[in-house]
């Protein structure tokens, strides 16, 4: 990936573009440029992968995954960034409704990376959930 591609990807993940520092860009670029990083990117973001995901979502078994959510018996915490452009907030509503013992915590002024953008609040919410 190019530096510009990394910057565009990072900015899509966050609410506050100030989080996308030169240091973060260089770190992610270095990681993505390793043989392992290139292989992961290829598996996750290639045209073939996107076509396979799209075909699966349109196929006759597309609903099957969600059909299993009511079987989850463990207490479940969903964390979501209110301003997530990757998986918008309404994407949390179906699992919230289908998982019997599920709760949702929404972080304001937060994109896809709640654990980075709202680190202290995220850790507090998750720790509180795990200690119950």
Spans of features found by a protein language model:
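Short beta-strand/loop motif that positions the catalytic acidic residue
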Residues: 72, 78-80
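Conserved short C-terminal alpha-helix that flanks the catalytic cleft of nucleotide-sugar-dependent
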Residues: 31-32, 95, 113
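Short alpha-helix in the alpha/beta-hydrolase fold that links the catalytic acid
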Residues: 24, 65, 74, 88-97
